[in-house]
Amino acid sequence: AIGSINPNTFQDQIYKYGSFGNPNEEVRQRALQHMFDSIAIMNAANSRDLSLWFADGSNHPGTANIRHRKQWFTECLQATHAQLQPEKRMLVEYKPFEPAFYHTDIADWGMALLMAKASGPAAKVLVDTGHHYHAQNIEQIVAWLLDEDMLGGFHFNDRRYADDDLTLGSIDPYQVF
């Protein structure tokens, strides 16, 4: 078995306006097919987790219908979840900004929690310690997710506000303990 499978729905130019949040249904279907292919790889590799991070969002007010994008995301995540075999999990990661700066479709842990709950029982939230607003209490987020049985895992890095993916403990070694 290997670790989690991380589908890439952001690098290809077809995703420049998003993947699951894209207003073009053909693009959303392509992203869904990529998820299904990733699940097939996950099953073949005997991996437990499908780890999802989306770059989807917008850079300027009025350029995206945020409610439609939320609905499309919910539909696509539900369709992805429906393809999971028993004992497999789908982890939904959030990020408040970057690459989009006006809005990201799954911007914080609350949005990820709602999306995961709407997706199905095998969906959980993935906490990346570099994906938070200034002064946000990550320990409190983890406690809430644990209490709701919705904590799926972590991506640890030591750059809390800009996601530079620094090695855990490189800035503040005491935070590891």
Task: Show where each model-derived region lies.
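Broad hydrophobic/π-residue packing in well-ordered secondary structure
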Residues: 8, 37, 130-131, 176
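Active-site flanking residues adjacent to catalytic metal/cofactor-binding acidic residues
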Residues: 92, 125-130, 156-157
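Active-site acidic/histidine proton-transfer and metal-coordination neighborhood
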Residues: 2-7, 13-124
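Gly/Pro-rich active-site loop or hairpin
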Residues: 64, 102-110, 131-177
